[in-house]
Amino acid sequence: MPVSPSRQNPSIADLPAKFILFGEDDIDDEDLLKEIIGNIDDSIYLLFVGNGKNLLDKLNELPDNHLPCLIVLDYNMPELNGAEILKEIKKNGRYATIPKVIWSTSNSENFRKTCIEAGANEYLIKPSNVTDLVDAARHMLSLC
């Protein structure tokens, strides 16, 4: 499965045409997502960034013709949380057509509402079992 080396950012030239940009600071969640999504569709490259500021920097350096097909954000990340990232992304119209998903352990209605208002297309609760995680991964891939 094509995935980014853990916590390393490939050059833009090395990114395949179709990729998902993940904001995820938990290495275990990253490894699990790599395995599950790779088993579903190994043609999609997964680029993981471990904090909100670095994710925005990576996104802003991408050319218009090489944007991710999906952005998935953990709500609780260092430097900028998922809602703060969404608000920044919303300011730039070039990201308007990219589906954006918040991926969180919190089932707080306030967090969900804040994220949807900030520009998330979906707010998914991180499942506690593998079957539900596979279903969530399939759903994310359907958005890409």
Protein language model annotation of sequence segments:
Residues 69, 73-75:
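Active-site residues of response regulator receiver
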Residues 54, 128-138:
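C-terminal output helix
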Residues 77-79:
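Receiver (REC) domain active-site loop signature in two-component systems and cognate sites
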Residues 46-56:
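Conserved Asp/Asn-Gly motif in the active-site loop of CheY-like receiver
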Residues 17-38, 71:
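Conserved acidic segment of CheY-like receiver
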